[in-house]
């Protein structure tokens, strides 16, 4: 056996598979990880584990697809939940921190999923994120933000929770329930499940021109001040078939409208950083990828954009398929959704007017009788 063959055999013995943990925290988080395994049961594997963590035993027991279930409780709680109190959720997480610390030993990357605005998800998620950051485990959060219909108190709790989370996590992705038509929150679950799947596959599936895990770490772990938010988004795959002379013009037109309807709070436009993965059908001989890149950069519209490109040549897609992971920075002090804030003010004004009208009606009725 020559030296090269010996080195090759040693290389085959190296175990460097990423260990990834997906933690659904609180009621909404439990629902999402359970839905992930319902729609994509093969996502869970030897190195990719899903967990449901809750202070509500009844809700936790109801989840059937996720097998790793963890109850956080203390002598005052006894598995009855956090009562919508983030401080209680944080306290329960602190009482569980030793177990969580042991549980996450050996992980390289963790995704924390939660609904913000109530107790366990809002309070516990920043606590767990801080533990992971202390252990130097790359961690990101995917969070839902309540609609106005859920009440201003709930929204205020969510906003305060995001400020705490922002100091702990490497980055987070925000889904606004306000954008769910008619309050159908199952839509949020479906969108977030897709985001989790796309994020995991972007990181774990090797490419011929590869995006390695250190690229991913560098993407998420950016220095920030407490005044900065660091948000990310992962797109749905954008697929296109080049089958005519004007295909590049059609590609530009369709990509311009890509993400026009987005349920997340931020799109790829104006992104500071991008990880772009392109699957290209190897049967395409004449494909000017430089033109495609130019179209993508035009949509992102940031001349200081940092980009890392991954490419794979496959036979199982129409022509080209693109995934984009993008990062943004926004001041925490600004409203998360300016349009939503304006709508909130209009609705509050309307409520005040209705209240005043109601008082006039009552006064008028009293005068009659």
From Swiss-Prot:
Q: Does the keyword Cell cycle apply?
A: yes
Query: Keyword rRNA-binding: yes or no?
Result: no
The superkingdom of the source organism is: Bacteria
How it assembles, according to the record, is:
Homodimer. Polymerizes to form a dynamic ring structure in a strictly GTP-dependent manner. Interacts directly with several other division proteins.
Its biological function? Essential cell division protein that forms a contractile ring structure (Z ring) at the future cell division site. The regulation of the ring assembly controls the timing and the location of cell division. One of the functions of the FtsZ ring is to recruit other cell division proteins to the septum to produce a new cell wall between the dividing cells. Binds GTP and shows GTPase activity.
Read off the PANTHER family from this record.
CELL DIVISION PROTEIN FTSZ-RELATED (PTHR30314), MITOCHONDRIAL DIVISION PROTEIN FSZA (PTHR30314:SF3)
Please report the name of this protein according to its UniProt entry: Cell division protein FtsZ
Q: Which organism is it from?
A: Mycoplasma genitalium (strain ATCC 33530 / DSM 19775 / NCTC 10195 / G37) (Mycoplasmoides genitalium)
